[in-house]
Regions:
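N-terminal topogenic module of multi-pass integral membrane proteins
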Residues: 1-53, 58
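Structural signature of hydrophobic alpha-helical transmembrane segments
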Residues: 2-13, 57-71, 115-127
Length: 207
């Protein structure tokens, strides 16, 4: 019987895989290429986190992550036209994956006994790194490097999780509140065009 954290991890994997496959389809990738992009989106953040925490990445011990990505590919193949008509499809699935993976990363780090600042960084890596790899694969400037609030939403959610944990709340409540903080921060930032200031260092050098 999967735990609550594992369920969040599986849902996050599916959501992030959908976001990667959806963008790959827009770039006219074939099915295999789309699967690779979806898989990279889904597992990259967790893999980097686990390597830093000296833990074996989950996809190396359990094929469910590969299966979730395969199901995401089938979902896009079967319902691709519906997904295209649905406004903000990519944004919705990407934000869901971002929120769920952030709390999984924070929770895993805290459970291993790391201090809160490490947990917040690991949560941010878990949530945002997959999107960076995805955008590199499809030759786009990663969202994390644009002026949109992206990784900062992970930081906000990580802090919310830590405060709840510090207050002695149950882990599922910490995950719910932390994930909601990530989700709402991202939604509100996009809705009200809240952005981080752009660093201005003069004109771009001539090539």
């Amino acid at each position: 019987m999967p735990t609550f954290v594992q369920i969040l991890d599986f849902i996050g994997t599916f959501a992030f895989a959908i976001s990667g496959i959806r963008l790959a389809s827009a770039k006219r990738f074939d099915w295999f290429g789309a699967y690779v992009v979806g898989l990279a989106t889904a597992i990259s953040g967790g893999t980097i986190r686990d390597v830093l925490l000296d833990v074996t990445p989950g996809w190396m011990t359990d094929p469910i992550y590969l299966i979730c990505t395969g199901l995401a590919l089938l979902w896009v193949i079967c319902f691709g036209r519906w997904l295209i008509r649905l406004n903000n499809t990519f944004f919705i699935f990407d934000t869901i994956g971002l929120a769920l993976f952030t709390v999984v990363g924070v929770g895993k780090s805290i459970a291993l006994g790391y201090p809160f600042w490490v947990a917040i960084i690991m949560g941010s890596i878990t949530g945002a790194a997959g999107g960076v790899i995805r955008d590199v694969f499809i030759n786009e400037i990663p969202l994390i490097f644009r002026k949109e609030i992206y990784a900062m939403a992970c930081v906000v959610g990580g802090i919310a999780y830590w405060i709840c944990d510090l207050a002695g709340m149950e882990s599922y409540a910490c995950q719910l509140i932390g994930g909601s903080a990530v989700f709402l921060t991202r939604i509100l930032a996009v809705k009200y065009h809240i952005c981080l200031p752009i660093l201005k260092g003069g004109e771009e050098p001539e090539e």
